Curated annotation (Swiss-Prot):
Family from the record: Belongs to the ABC transporter superfamily. Phosphate importer (TC 3.A.1.7) family.
Name of the featured protein: Phosphate import ATP-binding protein PstB
Location within or outside the cell: Cell inner membrane
Function summary: Part of the ABC transporter complex PstSACB involved in phosphate import. Responsible for energy coupling to the transport system.
Domain ABC transporter: from-to ranges: 27-268
Disulfide-bond pairs as recorded: none
C-alpha cells in the first residue's frame, strides 16, 4: 500500500463546501482517488461529512461506497497493492498521513460491519477488551463503562443478568447491537456502518435503525446501505455513487424527491442497480 499526500502540490487542505454552513464538517475528502492495483476504484471524491449527522452512501454493488468507508479509518492498509491519493481530514488531522498512529485513528473512527462479529468471549469481555487497549481502569470504573456501552447499544436490559455468557450465544440482532456497544465503548468520534442490517430480520433492523438515530446525538455517522428505504429513514444526507464517482450528494429528502442528476433518478426509481 502506498499513500500519496497531495498537500505540497495543492496547498493548504481546504475542505469542500458544506451542505449546511451551520453544521461543521467532521470528515472532509478532497480530490480523493483510490486504486486497487491498476483499477481506479474511487475517482476524485470531494465531500464533507457533517458532525452529529447521519450520512448515507447508496449505489449499485461495486460502485466504491464500501471502499470509501474503509478509507475513513484506513482499513485498506490491511491489504497489499493499493494506493490512495488526495486528502481526508478528520477535524484537522490528515487521515492519510503515513506517520499517523492507526490504533489511535481507529479509536476515533470506529466501524460496524455487515455481519455481526462478536469476539469468542463473554458479553462483558466483548466490551471491556477494546477499552483495555487504550485505558487502564479499576474494576468499578470498568463495570460502569461496560454498562454504559451496553445501554448505548440498547442491549443492557436484555443482557444485564448474563454478562458472563458468551457473546456468541446472542441472537443475530443482539450480536450486532453488541458490536455497536463494543464500538462506542472506546468513545469514538465517528462510527462507520457497512451494511449493518443486511443479515438481520425486520424487527432487529428496526432496533438498529432506532439506535443509529439516537447515536447521532453524540457521534458522527456514515452508513453504506443497499436499502434505499433505509437510507431515506435514517440519514440526514445521502450520496449516490456510481462506477467510483460521487454522482450526487445532498440532503436526503431532496436527493430522493428531486435529484439533480438523471443517473440518480434512474437508480432510485429502479431503472438500474
Amino acid at each position: 500500500m502506498t499513500t500519496v499526500s497531495t498537500a505540497a502540490a495543492s496547498g493548504p487542505a481546504v475542505p469542500p463546501p458544506r451542505i449546511d454552513p451551520d453544521v461543521p464538517a467532521k470528515v472532509a475528502a478532497r480530490n480523493l482517488n483510490f486504486y486497487y492495483g491498476q483499477h481506479h476504484a474511487l475517482k476524485n471524491i470531494n465531500l464533507s461529512i457533517a458532525a452529529n449527522r447521519v450520512t448515507a452512501f447508496i449505489g449499485p454493488s461495486g460502485c466504491g461506497k464500501s471502499t470509501l468507508l474503509r478509507i475513513f479509518n484506513r482499513m485498506y492498509d490491511l491489504y497489499p497493492g493499493q494506493r490512495v491519493e488526495g486528502r481526508v481530514l478528520l477535524d484537522d488531522t490528515d487521515i492519510l498521513d503515513p506517520k499517523l498512529d492507526l490504533n489511535l485513528l481507529r479509536a476515533r473512527v470506529g466501524m460496524v460491519f455487515q455481519k455481526p462479529t462478536p469476539f469468542p468471549m463473554t458479553i462483558y469481555e466483548n466490551i471491556a477488551f477494546g477499552i483495555r487497549l487504550y485505558e487502564k481502569l479499576p474494576k468499578s470504573e470498568m463495570d460502569s463503562r461496560v454498562e454504559k456501552a451496553l445501554r448505548d447499544g440498547a442491549l443492557w436490559t436484555e443482557v444485564k443478568d448474563k454478562l458472563n455468557a458468551s457473546g456468541l450465544s446472542l441472537s443475530g440482532g443482539q450480536q450486532q447491537r453488541l458490536c455497536i456497544a463494543r464500538t462506542v465503548a472506546v468513545r469514538p468520534e465517528v462510527i462507520l456502518f457497512d451494511e449493518p442490517c443486511s443479515a438481520l430480520d425486520p424487527i432487529s433492523t428496526a432496533k438498529v435503525e432506532e439506535l443509529i438515530d439516537e447515536l447521532k446525538t453524540h457521534y458522527t455517522i456514515a452508513i453504506v446501505t443497499h436499502n434505499m428505504q433505509q437510507a431515506a429513514r435514517v440519514s440526514d444526507y445521502t450520496s449516490f455513487m456510481y462506477l467510483g464517482e460521487m454522482i450526487e450528494f445532498g440532503p436526503t429528502d431532496k436527493l430522493f424527491t428531486s435529484p439533480s442528476d438523471r443517473r440518480t433518478q434512474d437508480y432510485i426509481t429502479g431503472r438500474f442497480g
